[in-house]
Every structure is written in structure tokens, then in C-alpha cells.
């Protein structure tokens, strides 16, 4: 019940949860604001989300609680089973002890052969039994068993020790007898064998007898186990029945207390009813004569005697109520009984009889109530006699106690959780406010950053424009014949496109500014679009940088080519000078040597040079012819294409003129556009041709330069070698001349001698010169061969260069294709950029559509983040609680493992004990008797309960009837009292009238007195009418609206309090709302 109550408490939402939540106000400055409490909530989706989350949490917590309850139930069942096992173990242990006692009594282990044993101590032990029948292991101090269990363990250990000792004695006796038999000489081996066989037979019979007993004991043990299970089930049923009986007794006690209270209330009401008021003697003092006084005194004395007698019989408490109960009879019965008029004395006698009979009935009822009270007291005493230890030691009481503890612990835990959740809610509200303020500041800061970024982009666009203008100026300063003009024009077009794109971006930025001022775009989408725009701008900037780098590389290449051409020209002039010098040197050599061979060689060299020059001229002419042929072919192709296009256009014009005469203006416009396109195509083709020519010239120049450089290097080498040889010859001639001059200057006497010597020397020199000439001729031949080889090498190199030229042409064509592909890519990039611009426009439109809901989305995002944070905190708290619970469960599992280990040890001990069980009948009989006694006692209690319940029902009925009868009698007694008073007054009037008639003549003055007495009587009657008919004390204040009978306030509300709610005069039912006050 406590858990259900707790769940109900959980399900109840907090009282001021919705009223305390701040609602939203639609504004542009702030995303959230407070709304009056009476206004409707704006963020209903968030409330639904929170409700769903709370439902999920509650369901998860319920599942966790159910799992924990199941685990607790499992633990309780295990503990219950453990306790039942212990109880069964105790029972079996008792049975085992009793069986062992019986076995010891039946079998005499101690024989009369003790005297035959030797006096020396026998050290041997019966190892077989000691190994087979081991004493149970002593329990550790950790195991906290009851004292009864420990005593039982000690008993079993002592019995097993006795059995082992007896068997050891028997073994020692058998050994001793065997030794005695061996020691005797008169006894033969056959006799010994016979004795041993007899002993073996006896032992086998004893073993069989013991085995039979053991089998019977096992059968009895099985039966006892079955009976114990059956008895345990019956005991549980009886416990349940006892519980039900206790509950019924408690209910009966509650009902009896209620009835006692009702009886006490009735007694109080009867005490409240006043006694019969006798008229005071002062009222009758004015009446003449003493007869009236005597009569009144007699009547009063009779009434007082009756009242006193009734008071003695009923006791002091009920005297007034019963005295008033004698005054309740109808007016018709008072005046007429069986059609006869009765006197006043007869009426009084009948009333006394009725009151006596009713008093007797009341006495009987009181006696019956006293008997019932005694019986109830006896039942209470019987219940109290039940010992508290028995109730406390019972399993259900302990289980209930444990459950109560668990439930109390869980209640404490849940209370702590509730307090924590309340604190978390308070912190969450504070956190929401702080986060709102932070978000407002963040949005303002973000707007400022966006405006700064826009200004930075404008500055960057202005800088790009300046750089573009500088580039345009640099490009215009260059020569238009440079082959990079096409790239420059393309770059200009791209730059113009970029300018247009930048202008469009500026327009879009201005639109975005306007849109941002109007609306608020969501944060994430704005960041995404910013990133996209930045990426596009960066990609375009990268493309611009690449184009600028290409332009710079092309300009550098052109500059390098120009410098190379200048260098080549300088080298050619230097080579011409070097050739002239070589020629002059060669001429000098030829003049000095005067050899024909040298002249022929020079002519050959000249011829070779001329041939080389002619070959170069031929190659150049061939290249020029090929270029001219290509140009002519291209021009022819262009002319053919133009002619074809013109023919097609003429055909189209003719068809259009025939079919559509009305659309001549449009056709003219189309023709103009087509002509412009043709011109642009022609321009493009010319530009491509110029580019091709320039590339071919560059390649040829490079190749020619390379070949010329190689040739010049070889020629320089040859010239250097020739110069060296000529220098040697010149030195020789100069030496000869010097010698001649020296000889001329010498003495004439020695001229002849010197001439002879000179002739001899000259001969020698001539011979050496001839040898040198031969060597020179050989060297010339070698040089000729080398020149031939060099020519061949140059021819091979020329062929290789032709091959490289063809390859370069192929590469040039591939580069053209690549250029075309790049142009196509640039076009595609432009189209993609236009598509991106269109997408940007669409996205701006989407942003303008979505900016209306941005405030709501931001608020929902904030709240969702807060709920996520709260949920994370709650999850962390739940995880901590789960960890704690898991630790508790682990500790409980460890305890259960210890308990299971204990139970396993006990089960092992049980398995050992059950092997040596012999009898368990006495305990069974005891239990049976106990169960029978319990059955008989329970049957008696049931019969008593049934009897008491019947008595209670009858007493309730009787009490209700008696109460109803007493109330009626009280009303009748009150009415009778009123009638009595009226009759007394009538008697007084009659007596006074008689006296007046007798004394009319004598006392005329008494008329005045009679008139005064009659007026007093009228006043009394009026007072009686104004007084309440129930109590005759208080005035009538309240009216019952249904029957219009008037009573005093106290009497009516006493009727309402007793839940009777019927009119005392007409017995008509009424409600508390039918009672109204009267004002005189």
C-alpha cells in the first residue's frame, strides 16, 4: 500500500509547475520574456516534449522500482527458504538424536568381556571406522547459530563418539580373543576356524539386522519428510486462517466499541430528558379548603414512590430517564380503553403497569449486554495470552518487518530525490534566466561581427578592383605581338566577370543587410551560408591568383625569349669576328708556308662553310614554306567554312522568307548577331594561329640556337688547334731569320765556315720541316675525317631535332586541347558560379521565410538545451543511485553467497547425518499432536467467532429495536406527563367549581379570586403551548419544514446527532436542511 501511495504521489504533478513557468512575448529585441499568468502558453511543442520526457523518466523509474522489488522478493524468498531449511534441519536433528538414543538403548555395545582385556593400554585404533565415521567439523566463531542448534550439534558429536568407541572396543576384543585362541596349544586350527565362522555368522546376522533397521529408518525418514512438507503447508494455511480470525476479531472489537459509544450516547440522551415537574404548592395556596392540598400531596407522594422504586431497580443513572418514560400514551388511549371511560386512578394504574413491563425489558437488555461484554473480555484475554515472542519469531511477522524497513528506506530515498528535484528546478529556472540574458548578448555581438565582416568584404573588393586596374595597365603596356595576348584577353574577361560577380555579391550583401535588419536568420543556417560564400570567394580568389600566376609566367617566358634572341645575336657577331680572325690567320699561314696544300684546304673549308650556310638556308626556307602552306591551308579551311556557313545562312534566309514574312526584323537581328559571332570566331581563329606561329617560332629559334651553339663550339675548337700550329711555324721562321741576321753580323772570315754550317743546319731543318709538313698533312687529313664525322653527327642531330620538333608539335596540339579544356572548365566554373548565385538568392528567400520563426526556434533551442542539461544531470544522479544500488546489491549478493555457503555446509552436515538416521517417530507424533491441538483450537476459535458474530448481529438488531422502542416510549411518557398535568388541572377546576357552587351564597367576594385563578391557568396553558413537548423546559425555537412541528433547538439537534432524524410527534423523516428558526 505504501508503494502504491508513493507512486500516486509521484504521478501528481507539482501544484505550481505550469503557473511558475515563464511564457514568451513576441518581440524583435529579446527572444523570450515573461507573460501574465492568465495568458495562454505559446510554446506548446516544448511543453509536449517536456511531458513526454517526464513520462519516459517516470516509466523508467517505475521499471527500475519493479526490478528492485522483484530482486527484493527473490531475496526474501531465498531467506525464507533458508530459514525453512534451518527449521527442517532442527527437526531432523532432533529426530536423529532421539533415534540414536533408541539405538544405544537397544544395542549393548559394552560386552561382558571387559575382564578378559589386558590391563595395558591398547594403542591401536579402529582406522576403518575412524575414516568412515568421521566426527562433524566444529563450527567456526563466524557462524552465529542459535544455542539450541549448537547443543544439538554437541549431542550428535557425543553420540558418534560413543558409537566409534564401542566399535573400537569390539575390534580390540575380537583381536584379543584371536590371540588367546592362537596362544592355546590344545585348540586346533579346525576348532579355531569353527569359532571364527561362528563369530562371523553372528556378526553377519547383526549386520543384517542393522541393515534392515537402516532400511526401515530410511523408509520412515522418507515418509516423515513427506509428512513434514504436508504439515508445513498445513501450518502455513493455519497461520493464514489465524490471521483472518485476528482480523475478524479486530473488526468485531471495532464494532463493539461503536455500539458502546451509541449506548453511551443513548444513556446521555435519557439523562438529558427531565423529570416530571409537579406544580408547586404556591400555585394552589389560594384555593380554599384543605382537600385540594391533601389530594395533591397524595398524588405527589404516589408518583415519588413509583419513581424511587424504578430508580432502585434500574440504578441511579437511569432513574430520570425511566421516570420520564412512564408518561407516553396517546390521548385516545388515555380517554377510551375498550370503549369505556376510565377514571383518573385506573389510568394511573395502567400506566404504572406499562412502565413496569418496559423496565423489565430494559433490565433483560442490560443483562444481555453485560454477558456480551464478559465474553468480549474473555476473547481479549485469550488474544492477549498469546505470547509476543511467538508472534515476533513467526516468519510472516519477520517478513513484514523486513518489508516495512525496505519500504521506509525507499520512502527516505524518494523524499531525498524529491528535495533534490525541487532544488534542481529552482536552479533550472535561474539558469534559464541567465542563459536568456547570455543569448541576447550573444546575438547582439553576432550582429556586430556580421556588420564588421560585411565592411571588411567591401574593403577587400575595393582592393581587388585596384589590383585589377593595375594588372590591366601592366597588360596594356606590353606589346600586342606577344603570343600571350589571348591569355591576357581571357584574363581580362575573367576579371570583368569577377567584377560583375563582386557587384552581384555587393548587391546580395546589401540585400542581406536589409533582410537582417528586418528579420533574424537562425544561427546555424547563417553560419552555413557564410561558409559557402567564403568558400566560393576563396575558390574564385584562388582561380584569380592562378590566372595571375599564369600571366606572370608567360610574361617571364617572353622576356626570357627576348633576352635569348639578343644573346644569340651577340654570339653571331662574335662568331663572325672570330671567323674573320681565323681567316686572316690562315692566310698568313698560307703566305708563310706557300704551300698549295694549305690553299686547297682553305678552299675546302670555305666550301664546307658555304655548304653549311646553304643547308641552313634551305632548312629555313623549308620551314617557311611549310608555315606558308599551313597558313594557306588554314585560310582555305576558314574560307570553306565561311562559305558553308554563308550557304547555310542563305538557305535559312530563303526558307525564313518563304515561311515567315512577318518576322523579317527578327531575322535581320539574328543575322547581325550571327555576323558578330563569325567575326568573333575569326578573331579567335586568328589569335589561335598567331599563338601557334609564335610557339613554332619559339621552338625553331630554340632548336637553331642549340645547333648554332654546338657548331660554334666545334669551330672554335678547330680554330684554336690551327692557331696553335701556325704559331709554331711562325716561331720557327722567326728563329731562322734571327740566325741569318746573326750570321751576317759575324766576321766575314768565318762566313764560309758558318754558311757551310748553316747549310748543314738548313738541310737538317728542311728535313725536319718536311717531316713537320708531312705531319701537318696527316693532321689535316685527320681533321678532314673529323669534320666529316662532325658533319655526320650534325646531320643525325638535325634528324633528332626534326623528331623533337614533331614531338613538340604533338605536345603543342595536346596543349591546345588542354587549353580548350581549361577554357571549357572556366566556362563551366562561370556557369556553376551563376548557379551558386541563383542558389544564394533562393537561400536568401528561404532565410527571409524562416526568419519569422527564428525567435521561437531560438527559444525552443534554449529550452531544449536546458532540458537536455537537466536530463543529463538527472541521468548522472540516477546513474549514481544505480551505482549505489548495484553496490548494495553486490553486498547483498555477497551476503547471500555467505548464506549459501553456510547452507551448503549445513546441507553437507545434513547429508552426513541422514546416512546414520534410525528413527524419527516420536517427533512426528509430537507434531501430529500439536497439529491436532491447533486444529481443535482453531475450530473452537472459529465456532466462537461464528457464535460471536451471530450474537453481534442479534445484539445490533436488538439494540436498534430497543433504542427505537425506548425513544417511542420516552415520547409517549412525555405526552402522558402532559396529559397528567392537564387532568390534574381539570380535577382542580372541578373541585374548585364544586366549592364555588356550595359557597356562592356565602362568599360573593370570591368571584374576583376565581377570575384571577382562571387567568393564571390560561397563562399556564399558554406557557405549556410555548414550551417544547419533548423536554418541557425550553421554549419552542425551531420548526421542521416538512411537518411544521415546533421544538426547541437542543431536542432537534440531539435527534440529528443520533442520526434518527424523524419527527417525535408524527415520526416523519427530515433532513438537517429542513430545520428553521422561529422568531417571536
UniProtKB/Swiss-Prot annotation:
Any GO CC annotation of this UniProt entry: nucleus
Compositionally skewed regions (Low complexity) per UniProt: 25-34, 284-312, 319-330, 994-1014
Catalytic activity: S-ubiquitinyl-[E2 ubiquitin-conjugating enzyme]-L-cysteine + [acceptor protein]-L-lysine = [E2 ubiquitin-conjugating enzyme]-L-cysteine + N(6)-ubiquitinyl-[acceptor protein]-L-lysine
GO MF term (any one): zinc ion binding
Chain segments annotated as coiled-coil in the UniProt record: 50-91, 149-169, 196-269, 331-1003
Disulfide pairings: none
GO annotation, biological process: chromatin organization; protein ubiquitination
Pathway: Protein modification; protein ubiquitination
Keywords: Chromatin regulator, Coiled coil, Metal-binding, Nucleus, Transferase, Ubl conjugation pathway, Zinc, Zinc-finger
Pfam families in UniProt: zf-C3HC4_2 (PF13923)
Subcellular location: Nucleus
InterPro entries with a match to the protein in the record: E3_ubiquit_lig_Bre1, Znf_RING, Znf_RING/FYVE/PHD, Znf_RING_CS
Top-level taxon of the source organism: Eukaryota
EC number: 2.3.2.27
CDD domains per record: RING-HC_Bre1-like (cd16499)
Zn-finger (RING-type) residues: 1028-1067
Family statement: Belongs to the BRE1 family.
Protein name: Probable E3 ubiquitin-protein ligase bre1
Record organism: Dictyostelium discoideum
Gene (name only): bre1
Amino acid at each position: 500500500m505504501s508503494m502504491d501511495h508513493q507512486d500516486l504521489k509521484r504521478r501528481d504533478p507539482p501544484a505550481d509547475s505550469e503557473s511558475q513557468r515563464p511564457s514568451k512575448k513576441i518581440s524583435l529585441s529579446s527572444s523570450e520574456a515573461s507573460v501574465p499568468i492568465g495568458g495562454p502558453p505559446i510554446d506548446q511543442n516544448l511543453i509536449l516534449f517536456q511531458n513526454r520526457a517526464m513520462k519516459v523518466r517516470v516509466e523508467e523509474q517505475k521499471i527500475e522500482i519493479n526490478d528492485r522489488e522483484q530482486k527484493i522478493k527473490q531475496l526474501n524468498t531465498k531467506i525464507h527458504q533458508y530459514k525453512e531449511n534451518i527449521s527442517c534441519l532442527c527437526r531432523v536433528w532432533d529426530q536423529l538424536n532421539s533415534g540414536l538414543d533408541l539405538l544405544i538403548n537397544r544395542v549393548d555395545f559394552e560386552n561382558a568381556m571387559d575382564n578378559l582385556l589386558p590391563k595395558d593400554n591398547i594403542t591401536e585404533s579402529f582406522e576403518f571406522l575412524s575414516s568412515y565415521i568421521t566426527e562433524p567439523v566444529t563450527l567456526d566463531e563466524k557462524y552465529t547459530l542459535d544455542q539450541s542448534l549448537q547443543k544439538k550439534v554437541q549431542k550428535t558429536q557425543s553420540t558418534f563418539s560413543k558409537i566409534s568407541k564401542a566399535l573400537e572396543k569390539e575390534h580390540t576384543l575380537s583381536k584379543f580373543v584371536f590371540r588367546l585362541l592362537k596362544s592355546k596349544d590344545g585348540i586346533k586350527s579346525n576348532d579355531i576356524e569353527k569359532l571364527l565362522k561362528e563369530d562371523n555368522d553372528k556378526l553377519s546376522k547383526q549386520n543384517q539386522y542393522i541393515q534392515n533397521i537402516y532400511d526401515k529408518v530410511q523408509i520412515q525418514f522418507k515418509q516423515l519428510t513427506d509428512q513434514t512438507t504436508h504439515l508445513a503447508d498445513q501450518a502455513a494455511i493455519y497461520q493464514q486462517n489465524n490471521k483472518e480470525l485476528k482480523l475478524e476479531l479486530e473488526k468485531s472489537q471495532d464494532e463493539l466499541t461503536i455500539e458502546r459509544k451509541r449506548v453511551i450516547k443513548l444513556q446521555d440522551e435519557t439523562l438529558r430528558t427531565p423529570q416530571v415537574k409537579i406544580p408547586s404548592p404556591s400555585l394552589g395556596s389560594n384555593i380554599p379548603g384543605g382537600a385540594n392540598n391533601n389530594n395533591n400531596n397524595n398524588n405527589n407522594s404516589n408518583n415519588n414512590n413509583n419513581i424511587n422504586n424504578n430508580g432502585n431497580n434500574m440504578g441511579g443513572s437511569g432513574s430520570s430517564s425511566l421516570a420520564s418514560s412512564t408518561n407516553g400514551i396517546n390521548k385516545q388511549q388515555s380517554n377510551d380503553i375498550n370503549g369505556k371511560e376510565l377514571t383518573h386512578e385506573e389510568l394511573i394504574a395502567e400506566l404504572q403497569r406499562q412502565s413496569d413491563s418496559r423496565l423489565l425489558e430494559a433490565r433483560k437488555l442490560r443483562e444481555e449486554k453485560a454477558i456480551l461484554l464478559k465474553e468480549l473480555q474473555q476473547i481479549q484475554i485469550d488474544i492477549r495470552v498469546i505470547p509476543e515472542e511467538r508472534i515476533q519469531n513467526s516468519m510472516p511477522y519477520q517478513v513484514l518487518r523486513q518489508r516495512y524497513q525496505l519500504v521506509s528506506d525507499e520512502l527516505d530515498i524518494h523524499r531525498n530525490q524529491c528535495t533534490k528535484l525541487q532544488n534542481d528546478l529552482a536552479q533550472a529556472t535561474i539558469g534559464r534566466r541567465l542563459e536568456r540574458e547570455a543569448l541576447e548578448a550573444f546575438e547582439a555581438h553576432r550582429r556586430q561581427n556580421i556588420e564588421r565582416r560585411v565592411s571588411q568584404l567591401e574593403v577587400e573588393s575595393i582592393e581587388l578592383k585596384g589590383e585589377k586596374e593595375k594588372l590591366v595597365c601592366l597588360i596594356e603596356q606590353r606589346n600586342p605581338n606577344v603570343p600571350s595576348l589571348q591569355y591576357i584577353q581571357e584574363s581580362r574577361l575573367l576579371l570583368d566577370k569577377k567584377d560583375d560577380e563582386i557587384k552581384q555579391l555587393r548587391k546580395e550583401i546589401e540585400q542581406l543587410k536589409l533582410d537582417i535588419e528586418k528579420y533574424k536568420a537562425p544561427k546555424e543556417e547563417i553560419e552555413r551560408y557564410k561558409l559557402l560564400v567564403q568558400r566560393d570567394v576563396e575558390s574564385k580568389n584562388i582561380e584569380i591568383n592562378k590566372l595571375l600566376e599564369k600571366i606572370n609566367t608567360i610574361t617571364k617566358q617572353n622576356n626570357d625569349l627576348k633576352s635569348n634572341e639578343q644573346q644569340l645575336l651577340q654570339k653571331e657577331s662574335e662568331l663572325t669576328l672570330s671567323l674573320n680572325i681565323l681567316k686572316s690567320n690562315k692566310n698568313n699561314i698560307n703566305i708563310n708556308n706557300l704551300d698549295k696544300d694549305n690553299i686547297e684546304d682553305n678552299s675546302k673549308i670555305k666550301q664546307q662553310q658555304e655548304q653549311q650556310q646553304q643547308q641552313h638556308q634551305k632548312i629555313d626556307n623549308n620551314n617557311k614554306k611549310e608555315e606558308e602552306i599551313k597558313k594557306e591551308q588554314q585560310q582555305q579551311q576558314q574560307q570553306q567554312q565561311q562559305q558553308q556557313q554563308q550557304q547555310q545562312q542563305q538557305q535559312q534566309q530563303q526558307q525564313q522568307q518563304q515561311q515567315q514574312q512577318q518576322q523579317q526584323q527578327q531575322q535581320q537581328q539574328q543575322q547581325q548577331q550571327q555576323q558578330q559571332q563569325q567575326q568573333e570566331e575569326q578573331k579567335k581563329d586568328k589569335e589561335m594561329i598567331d599563338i601557334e606561329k609564335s610557339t613554332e617560332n619559339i621552338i625553331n629559334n630554340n632548336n637553331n640556337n642549340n645547333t648554332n651553339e654546338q657548331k660554334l663550339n666545334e669551330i672554335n675548337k678547330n680554330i684554336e688547334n690551327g692557331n696553335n700550329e701556325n704559331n709554331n711555324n711562325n716561331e720557327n721562321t722567326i728563329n731562322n731569320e734571327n740566325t741569318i741576321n746573326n750570321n751576317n753580323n759575324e766576321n766575314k772570315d768565318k762566313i764560309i765556315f758558318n754558311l757551310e754550317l748553316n747549310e748543314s743546319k738548313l738541310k737538317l731543318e728542311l728535313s725536319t720541316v718536311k717531316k713537320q709538313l708531312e705531319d701537318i698533312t696527316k693532321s689535316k687529313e685527320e681533321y678532314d675525317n673529323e669534320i666529316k664525322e662532325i658533319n655526320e653527327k650534325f646531320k643525325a642531330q638535325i634528324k633528332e631535332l626534326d623528331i623533337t620538333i614533331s614531338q613538340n608539335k604533338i605536345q603543342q596540339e595536346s596543349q591546345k586541347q588542354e587549353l580548350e579544356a581549361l577554357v571549357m572548365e572556366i566556362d563551366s566554373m562561370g556557369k556553376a558560379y551563376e548557379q551558386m548565385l541563383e542558389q544564394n538568392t533562393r537561400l536568401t528567400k528561404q532565410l527571409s521565410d524562416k526568419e519569422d520563426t527564428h525567435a521561437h526556434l531560438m527559444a525552443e533551442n534554449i529550452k531544449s538545451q536546458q532540458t537536455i542539461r537537466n536530463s543529463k544531470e538527472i541521468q548522472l544522479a540516477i546513474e549514481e543511485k544505480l551505482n549505489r544500488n548495484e553496490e548494495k546489491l553486490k553486498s547483498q549478493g555477497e551476503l547471500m553467497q555467505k548464506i549459501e555457503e553456510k547452507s551448503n555446509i549445513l546441507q553437507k552436515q545434513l547429508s552426513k547425518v541422514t546416512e546414520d538416521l534410525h528413527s524419527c517417530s516420536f517427533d512426528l507424533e509430537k507434531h501430529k499432536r500439536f497439529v491436532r491441538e491447533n486444529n481443535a483450537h482453531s475450530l473452537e476459535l472459529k465456532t466462537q467467532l461464528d457464535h460471536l458474530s451471530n450474537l453481534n448481529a442479534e445484539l445490533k438488531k436488538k439494540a436498534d429495536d430497543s433504542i427505537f422502542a425506548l425513544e417511542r416510549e420516552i415520547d409517549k411518557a412525555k405526552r402522558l406527563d402532559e396529559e397528567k398535568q392537564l387532568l390534574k388541572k381539570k380535577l382542580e377546576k372541578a373541585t374548585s367549581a364544586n366549592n364555588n357552587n356550595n359557597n356562592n351564597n356565602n362568599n360573593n367576594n370570591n368571584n374576583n379570586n376565581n377570575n384571577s385563578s382562571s387567568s393564571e391557568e390560561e397563562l399556564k396553558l399558554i406557557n405549556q403551548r410555548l414550551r417544547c413537548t419533548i423536554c418541557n423546559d425550553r421554549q419552542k425555537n425551531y420548526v421542521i419544514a416538512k411537518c411544521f412541528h415546533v421544538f426547541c433547538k437542543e431536542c432537534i439537534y440531539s435527534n440529528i446527532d443520533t442520526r434518527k432524524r424523524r419527527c417525535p410527534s408524527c415520526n416523519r423523516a427530515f433532513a438537517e436542511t429542513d430545520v428553521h428558526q422561529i422568531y417571536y
